[in-house]
Every structure is written in C-alpha cells, then in structure tokens.
Amino acid sequence: MAPIAVGDVVPDGTISFFDENDQLQTASVHSLAAGKKVILFGVPGAFTPTCSMKHVPGFIEKAEELKSKGVDEIICFSVNDPFVMKAWGKTYPENKHVKFVADGSGEYTHLLGLELDLKDKGLGVRSRRFALLLDDLKVTVANVESGGEFTVSSADDILKAL
C-alpha cells in the first residue's frame, strides 16, 4: 500500500485511548478529526528513546503555539495497546494538549501505509515516525521519516508548514 500523501483524505479506522475520566474509549479517526485541523503524529513505540526524549516533548512544548495557529487537536499515535499509551502519557505531567492513542493491532498504521518492520529488533511491525497535518480529514502536510530517523516530523517542522 502506498504511504499516505498530501491531498489524500485520511482513511477511517479505529483507535483506542483513555479519556479525561480514565475510561477506555474506542473511536474512529474520522470522528476525532472531521471538521477540525488536527496533527496526527506517529512514533515507532511508546517509551522508546527518540520518541520519549525528542518527538513527544516537542509537541507538548509547542502545543500552545500550534493551537494559536489554528490546530484543534494534537494526537500522538503508536502501535501499542491503550494501557501502554496511558502509562506513557502520564510520564509527561506538563502535558495539557497531546492525546495519546493506540493502534493496538497496527491495522490503522497499515491503512496509512506507514508500517515499519522492526521484527529484527524484537518489536514486530510498528509505525514509521511521521507527522500529518489534517484539515477536515484532508492531508495538507505529510512529513514521513525513513526508517527510524527523526529529521522531518518534529513540532517545529509542522509549525513551519502552518
């Protein structure tokens, strides 16, 4: 499957997360993003070094600035289960705006065409690192990394595109 690209409508799919009342929710991506400007950024795995020390903190630190430029939602996405994503989110007590969501089986990652095969590292099939800017479900920015790199998908990269 070809990777998601600028001009595409983001596919619909199901993701899971814990809401503000600590209740497990399952929702469609379209229900979360329709009619909104949304950043959907993906990471290969919760608690992994680059994701935990660079990618996620950048979006947390820049969240207010992103929102001031019209972003309604900032969603962190990973092929992990929702319990892992909840625990990972709690390691950022300063976070007020980034929602941590799970693609437990990797099905949505497949729909995006953004799988990263990390079986040789014992991690299975994960998501490539990426940052998408969606405007009412349409991809307006698609910053997708090669392999496990972190060169084009930061919060600063999205800010430059806004």
Curated annotation (Swiss-Prot):
Pfam families: Redoxin. The active site is at 51 (cysteine sulfenic acid (-soh) intermediate). InterPro entries: PRX5-like, Redoxin, Thioredoxin-like_sf, Thioredoxin_domain. It is found in: Cytoplasm. The keyword Oxidoreductase applies. It comes from the Eukaryota. The keyword Isomerase does not apply. GO terms for cellular component: chloroplast; cytosol; nucleus; plasma membrane. Expressed in all tissues but mostly in reproductive tissues such as buds, flowers, siliques and seeds. CDD domains: PRX5_like. The active site is a conserved redox-active cysteine residue, the peroxidatic cysteine (C(P)), which makes the nucleophilic attack on the peroxide substrate. The peroxide oxidizes the C(P)-SH to cysteine sulfenic acid (C(P)-SOH), which then reacts with another cysteine residue, the resolving cysteine (C(R)), to form a disulfide bridge. The disulfide is subsequently reduced by an appropriate electron donor to complete the catalytic cycle. In this 1-Cys peroxiredoxin, no C(R) is present and C(P) instead forms a disulfide with a cysteine from another protein or with a small thiol molecule. Belongs to the peroxiredoxin family. Prx5 subfamily. Monomer. This is Peroxiredoxin-2B. The lineage of its organism: Eukaryota, Viridiplantae, Streptophyta, Embryophyta, Tracheophyta.
